[in-house]
């Protein structure tokens, strides 16, 4: 069974587009939302979304790899190989950065400046007001009326560290997505 090059290109661009979109939206949410809202009100929702996004990205990358493998050897576009590795490599990189950040987090001291920055962070425009100990996210059944353990909270410094790495990976993913599309027009 052989797959035509057009189908391989279509699956490749769809897979990369899906992954780039998921990563971009996650990065924008992480950067624009104050850390106290992320950790106290949206943590479980974002973790669930992250798990399902990983599964969806894995399935799309698997379909891409399978279609590439099933294509005739002479009709496999080489420029798509870099796109095939983006999702697994960036997911592994972000996972390792996250593990390092969790190990580093207890060492990230929460000095008074960090606490003041966290309290002064503004919500995005038109966002309903969220106060500590008040209205948890309605979509997170597991988080309602629960308080987080003090050791699970992150300082502003540790949060910005993770946001920086997410931004870098998002930029690389979008660049690779654009490159695969533009190289597809040349081929």
From Swiss-Prot:
**Location in the cell:** Membrane
Q: What is its main location?
A: membrane
Composition bias type Basic and acidic residues, residue spans: 114-134
GO cellular component term, pick one: mitochondrion
What residue intervals traverse the membrane?
A: 11-31, 45-65, 80-100, 162-182
The record ties this protein, via InterPro entries, to: ATG33
Where does the source fall among the domains of life?
Eukaryota
Q: What keywords would UniProt list here?
A: Membrane, Transmembrane, Transmembrane helix
Q: How does it sit in the membrane?
A: Multi-pass membrane protein
Stretches assigned to coiled coil: none
UniProt record, GO biological process = autophagy of mitochondrion; macroautophagy
Region annotated Disordered sits at 114-135
**Additional facts recorded:** Present with 3210 molecules/cell in log phase SD medium.
Family recorded in the similarity comment: Belongs to the ATG33 family.
The name of this protein is: Protein SCM4
UniProt organism field: Saccharomyces cerevisiae (strain ATCC 204508 / S288c)
